[in-house]
Amino acid sequence: KAAYAASFATDTISDEYKIMTKSLVEKLDKVGVREESGVKIVKDLGIEKAVNVLDPVFLLEKEQWDNIATKEFNEKYILVYDFDKSLVIEALAKEISKKKGYKIYTINVDKPKYADKCFNLDGPETFVSLVKNAQFVISNSFHAAVFSLVYEKDFVIVNRTESINTRMRDLLSSLTIGDRLIGKDYDINKVIEEINYDNVKPILNEKIDFSKQYLYDLLSIKK
């Protein structure tokens, strides 16, 4: 039995759940968690076998995701994927749109007033295609960050609640781009700076290799 890319989505667990959590995690032969903070949680329970692995999205090559990212769009646009109707995201999208002359595309149930185009009730092929073809991505979604990294997009992730931020904070910090997680006091000039993927990719590729090896190792366990 093993876990791959399990997520606590928090930095701590309350005392009332520690005994139960420990008893269940101890039954696993290997424990791969999505956040460094998750590794610490498991170690604090007295279990030493937890390691940090990447979200499964990263286990496929960009070219494999291209097989579903087949939709094309004729305009240059900012992609906004917002769970919370964030005023920070709205202000940021408007500001970048004005500076760059890009349209604003959103993924929402209802079209925000500031959006030029809205996509709803669409499937994964539309989501991945929108990230792939965007000039810039603004979101508070972990997987918007993940696919932005896959396609080497310039992006920012806007703070939600601290516990939800954990997985995004840990991932971005581990790739030396922790400044891509922003709050209401953002600096627009820093936000629109291009991400240096020449620095990011070697770190990310090393983590991908480690994550794949973790899977190979656990699949070779004989019971």
Where are these regions (language model features)?
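Active-site anion-handling motifs in enzyme catalytic cores
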Residues: K1-K223
